[in-house]
Amino acid sequence: MEQDNLYNLLQSIDTPDDLRHLSADKLPEVCKELRQKIIDELSCNPGHFGSSLGVIELTVALHYVFNTPYDRIVWDVGHQAYGHKILTGRRDAFCTNRKLNGIRPFPSPSESEYDTFTCGHASNSISAALGMAVAAKKHGENNRHVVAVIGDGSMSGGLAFEGLNNASATPNNLLIILNDNNMAIDRSVGGMKQYLLNLQMSEGYNRIRYKISQMFHRWGILNEERRKSLIRFNNSLKSMLVQQQNVFEGMNIRYFGPIDGHDVNNLARVLKEIKDMQGPKLLHIHTTKGKGFGPAEKAATIWHAPGIFDKETGERIVVDTKGMPPLFQDVFGNTLLELAQTNDKIVGVTPAMPSGCSMNILMKAMPERGFDVGIAEGHAVTFSGGMAKDGLLPFCNIYSSFMQRAYDNVIHDIAIQKLNVVLCLDRAGLVGEDGPTHHGAFDLAYMRPIPNLIVASPYNEHELRCLMYTAQLPDKGPFVIRYPRGRGSLVDWKCPMQEIEIGKGRKLKEGKDIAVITLGPIGVQAEKAITHAEQETGKSIAHYDLRFLKPLDESMLHEIGKRFKQVVTVEDGVLKGGMGSAILEFMADNEYNPQIKRIGLPDQFVQHGSVKELYHICGMDEEGIYKVLISF
């Protein structure tokens, strides 16, 4: 009851209709309660913190001014949409956010009609919202508004510019909200960041243009000829009143702002003024990531997703990791620095994830050799290719699910030319609470068919170090190393690095009845299951670590094909087209006929939950592998 008293207004808002019945003077209090609700919930149930706090006022203003869900709001990335979820019927369920069978971590149309488009990756909001705005026009729904909310570094993505470039090509009333907080997860980078910092627009120009537009709209005399005349007048007016060229206006998108994104009443006023203007338009707002929670405002990167924390003191509850294996990410970062200290050709590239992938270790020690290119995965790959073409050796680290956005670049710009680029796919396999948009489910299947690639996955931290060492040796060509999120299995991980023969797996355990073939760290789960199954059944089970999906260790597979009638494959990726499929193809091509059972991700988008829970559901944990082994 005491907790409910903190949310007197919020408790009365079950849908945005309830919000719209409040007087405008109540909106600041709604914002205060909404911000406190997120702080309270995320202090004990971790999630994306800073981004959601930064758009509280915008979220309230949007649902207050627009007739959602008839009017469409498309969130870019979606990690800032917690306030939106709470205001749209999920207030009481918000405590289940990111938990197994709870509400989803990002907006999802299957969860709510207020979630207009699936999101989780960056830079797609303008294109999606533009499509909706054009569809509304085609359907004669001239009173339907469509809003794209983009920020958190997403404007550095090429898809955002493709949407902007196309926005004025077809009649529509799209409104783009540019949430400018100078942040992605880490600090935003690049020319667009600097442009937005400097951008100013004449208030007189905006005011005059708006009044003229309203007058023509009110009189009903805005035909095509007059619209073209207005555009010519607009350009002349702009040349007189605007002090600098505006890239958005150059694309025939009306620009408004920048304005304070934390003044909810002024935001609502401006949105009301511009929402019925004809044609595409952009409202530029300035916000602070983590607004309203002091520690998050001061350290936005750490507080992007801080984990559990004390909401009174702001102290993050850090788990004691002494005696635990390291994160694969930290092994990568430290090993990269170690290699760079002896190989002056090595450089590091990351698309806006230096802290997430631990590229920041190299960037701090050797800032001139680390490149954060912003949320631009395709550019990151081709940029790496360009450096490799002229003698550098890039380690390009991209999350597996985000590498999907750069697939053509891998084929066209790296593989065909057989360039010496090391593609490190972090977060490969199931990642847990971030759900289907972030699981690294497909990389084995989509990398396997590409000629000239080497595709490998380490069993543990030692193998990661040795694969990185091998990849930086001369003339290896394009080299893909995939590894999961989280901790490995070895506490003592700083082994001497040595070359691994390309395409060579290893036999971890001898056996005579069943052969288990694994790829990557999921082999540790199989190792436990093998011990359990042997104890229960008395069967002798061999264990092979494939290490390389491409090229395959054909001599090892010939041995398995000749010796075993029962084979189990285990992989942390989709079964269709993955490692198990490669084994099936090899056995068929070489006329071996063992009984093969494959363990991996099913043909569906796996939901969110802890990795442990999801492994169990997919039958990929020790228990699931054990059940398959004893089923022969």
Curated annotation (Swiss-Prot):
GO terms for molecular function: 1-deoxy-D-xylulose-5-phosphate synthase activity; magnesium ion binding; thiamine pyrophosphate binding. Coiled coil: none annotated. The lineage of its organism: Bacteria, Pseudomonadati, Bacteroidota, Bacteroidia, Bacteroidales. Homodimer. It catalyses: D-glyceraldehyde 3-phosphate + pyruvate + H(+) = 1-deoxy-D-xylulose 5-phosphate + CO2. The keyword Metal-binding applies. Its EC number is 2.2.1.7. Mg(2+) binds at D152, N181. The keyword Nuclease does not apply. NCBIfam families: dxs, PRK05444.2-2. Thiamine diphosphate binds at H79, G120, H121, A122, G153, S154, N181, F293, E377. One of its GO terms (biological process) is 1-deoxy-D-xylulose 5-phosphate biosynthetic process. One of its GO terms (cellular component) is cytosol. CDD domains: TPP_DXS, TPP_PYR_DXS_TK_like. This is 1-deoxy-D-xylulose-5-phosphate synthase. Binds 1 Mg(2+) ion per subunit. Binds 1 thiamine pyrophosphate per subunit. Catalyzes the acyloin condensation reaction between C atoms 2 and 3 of pyruvate and glyceraldehyde 3-phosphate to yield 1-deoxy-D-xylulose-5-phosphate (DXP). Keywords: Isoprene biosynthesis, Magnesium, Metal-binding, Thiamine biosynthesis, Thiamine pyrophosphate, Transferase. Its cofactor is Mg(2+); thiamine diphosphate. Pathway: Metabolic intermediate biosynthesis; 1-deoxy-D-xylulose 5-phosphate biosynthesis; 1-deoxy-D-xylulose 5-phosphate from D-glyceraldehyde 3-phosphate and pyruvate: step 1/1. Pfam families: DXP_synthase_N, Transket_pyr, Transketolase_C. Belongs to the transketolase family. DXPS subfamily.
